[in-house]
């Protein structure tokens, strides 16, 4: 985390940006934990290793001392603090031209919005920290903002990001397309379907992203950029900058740790001819393992935002707006690419189309951390997973409550 006096000009500000992106590579962020729990909490993946923390998450039986729930919370706030440091310091300096200032602060606003959306999906209302902190006791007076207030701040940050960012080409740093894509996701979760459709359409129409012709090409060992990438986190084989997604899913016979694996439920959801099932799930003998990520050297990049998701965001938004022929046409784009059975509108109702799109999201985005948040936002997690409704939010880490007694715990913990 930059010290208060470390950012003095555009060069040091860009170094601070690099540090901010490094935080996203962390094993407690997109390098491992945060991606994995999105499937482990759901019907997509199950614990196959020795981690008691992961076993609790798999069973939807966490307690307030769960180590993974703490690590993803702490890393998200660490990433937020890095963004806040940039925003506060760059905003106070007068030796930046307008374009440089806008680009640098725009990237920081985006990352802060991304982290708060990640947090609100798992924990519900969370504390809003909008300025950097360096004192470990600075959070003693924190309280939780409401979910609605957190969403308001996320959208405000995305507006600020869009106003500042001028770059529209990069996929490894924040671009204008990434801002529109994240806003589409946020609005879908918020239930603003007209807004989500409009933003997703802008991503499709105003930028040069294209679906790759073959699904496996999205997840290359070399991390080659594809036409579908919108924003991705870069991994390098150095300590906490590695991606552990392939290690954790790969069978031990393939050099992995086999910490978690796809469920038989997910396997059964794929048609035998669906290329996504063939790519995402493999077997070592009779033992199934996740094979979406295949760089056992830890260098595989993670697609935080990609066009396949945006297509399905638009499809769902269109369906909820009762524009069913358009919704089905959007959904068919990912089905055709995957050689999967093609859904036709026929006499299907609006709800049946929505259900088909939700099922398609599961198949397209499997093992990318989206299934649990989908089940929760749709209000079906308790039914699908046969769990108590109080288990659909993660516990606020007890160590955080110990420091800030004003933080209330989620029900059931």
Question: PLM features: residue spans?
Answer:
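Acidic, glycine-rich segments characteristic of secretory precursors and extracytoplasmic regions
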Residues: 1-38, 404-413
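Inward-facing hydrophobic residues that define packing positions of alpha-helical scaffold repeats
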Residues: 17, 80-83, 117, 151, ...
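Hydrophobic-face positions in mid-chain alpha helices that act as interaction patches
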Residues: 41-45, 51-55, 197-307, 364, ...
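Aromatic-residue-lined binding/catalytic grooves and analogous aromatic/hydrophobic interfacial grooves
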Residues: 125, 155-159, 165, 176-215, ...
């Amino acid at each position: 985390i930059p010290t208060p006096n470390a950012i003095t000009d555009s060069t040091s500000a860009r170094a601070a940006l690099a540090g901010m992106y490094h935080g996203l590579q962390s094993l407690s962020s997109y390098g491992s934990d945060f991606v994995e729990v999105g499937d482990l909490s759901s019907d997509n993946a199950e614990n196959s290793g020795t981690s008691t923390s992961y076993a609790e998450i798999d069973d939807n039986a966490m307690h307030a001392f769960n180590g993974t729930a703490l690590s993803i919370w702490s890393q998200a706030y660490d990433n937020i603090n890095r963004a806040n440091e940039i925003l506060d310091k760059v905003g106070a300096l007068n030796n930046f031209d307008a374009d440089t200032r806008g680009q640098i602060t725009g990237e920081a606003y985006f990352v802060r919005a991304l982290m708060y959306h990640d947090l609100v999906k798992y924990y519900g209302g969370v504390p809003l920290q909008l300025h950097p902190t360096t004192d470990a006791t600075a959070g003693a007076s924190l309280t939780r903002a409401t979910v609605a207030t957190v969403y308001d701040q996320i959208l405000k940050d995305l507006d600020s990001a869009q106003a500042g960012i001028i770059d529209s080409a990069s996929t490894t740093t924040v671009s204008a397309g990434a801002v529109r894509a994240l806003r589409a996701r946020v609005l879908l979760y918020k239930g603003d379907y007209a807004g989500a459709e409009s933003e997703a359409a802008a991503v499709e129409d105003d930028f040069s992203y294209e679906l790759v012709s073959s699904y496996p090409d999205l997840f290359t060992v070399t991390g080659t950029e594809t036409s579908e990438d919108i924003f991705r986190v870069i991994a390098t084989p150095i300590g906490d900058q590695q991606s552990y997604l392939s290690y954790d899913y790969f069978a031990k016979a393939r050099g992995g740790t086999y910490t978690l694996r796809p469920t038989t439920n997910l396997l059964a959801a794929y048609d035998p001819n669906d290329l996504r099932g063939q790519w995402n799930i493999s077997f070592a003998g009779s033992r199934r393992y996740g094979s979406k990520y295949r760089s056992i050297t830890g260098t595989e990049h993670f697609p935080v935002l990609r066009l396949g998701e945006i297509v399905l965001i638009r499809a769902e938004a269109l369906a909820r707006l009762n524009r069913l022929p358009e919704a089905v046409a959007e959904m068919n784009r990912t089905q055709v690419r995957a050689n999967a059975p093609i859904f036709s509108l026929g006499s299907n109702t609006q709800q049946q189309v929505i259900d088909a799109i939700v099922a398609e999201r599961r198949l397209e985005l499997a093992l990318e951390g989206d299934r649990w948040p989908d089940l929760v936002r749709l209000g079906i997690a308790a039914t699908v997973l046969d769990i108590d409704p109080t288990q659909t939010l993660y516990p606020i880490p007890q160590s955080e409550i110990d420091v800030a007694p004003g933080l209330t715990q989620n029900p059931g913990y």
